[in-house]
Design a protein with these regions (language model features):
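Acidic, proline/serine/threonine- and glycine-rich low-complexity intrinsically disordered segments
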Residues: 155-157
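Conserved small/polar residues in nucleotide/adenosyl-binding loops
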Residues: 159-165
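Active-site loop/lid in soluble adenylation, ligation, and acyl-transfer enzymes
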Residues: 1-148
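Feature captures the catalytic ectodomains and active-site-proximal regions of enzymes
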Residues: 151
């Protein structure tokens, strides 16, 4: 149990208020697909998600600004709570999120299948004719969409997908 006010519970992450400038972000073991959160958990998933994210933040270093804070878990939580969420949580700065969902598709399913049926493509990428539902795609596809409520995602055109590069220098 975390003795901080919970401010948000997402599909796989929970946010707790640390102070006016910081949040505690905890990656859970919840499983979600197609906007559905399943009742079964994947033990250790939250730790792996956090380690993967931290790996990328370290790789990009200060070349790409991010939400990580200099505060450590033991700066904001008692030792017992730190042990319970070790390796699955980070203290982050309160910032405005970039509401883009990064979807990588290996199979023709879900919204990708619907778009393929209508257009023969997914996210402006033309696919071979005659593919069936759940067919393996010729290569993995990056198909970004807006991060929104359940069932309300909109595809994002590659021409509109840009980083605020002026902030990166």
């Amino acid at each position: 149990m975390i003795d901080l006010p919970k401010v948000y519970s997402g599909k796989v992450r929970d946010l707790y208020e640390v102070d006016d400038d910081h949040l505690l972000m905890v990656a859970t073991d919840r499983l979600s697909a197609f906007d559905v959160v399943f009742t079964d958990l994947i033990p250790g998933k939250g730790k792996i998600l956090t380690q993967m994210s931290n790996c990328w933040f370290a790789f990009f270093g200060n070349r790409v600004p991010n939400h990580l804070s200099d505060l450590m878990l033991d700066d904001v939580l008692p030792e017992k709570e730190v042990q319970a969420i070790a390796q699955r949580a980070v203290v982050v700065k309160k910032l405005q999120p970039v509401k883009i969902e990064a979807v990588v598709r290996g199979y023709l399913a879900g919204g990708g299948w619907k778009e393929y049926q209508a257009k023969g493509s997914i996210s402006e990428i033309t696919l071979p004719a005659g593919l069936q539902r759940a067919s393996a795609l010729p290569q993995a596809l990056f198909t970004p969409s807006t991060k929104a409520g359940v069932g309300t995602h909109d595809a994002v055109s590659y021409t509109h997908l840009t980083l605020p590069t002026s902030d990166l220098v």
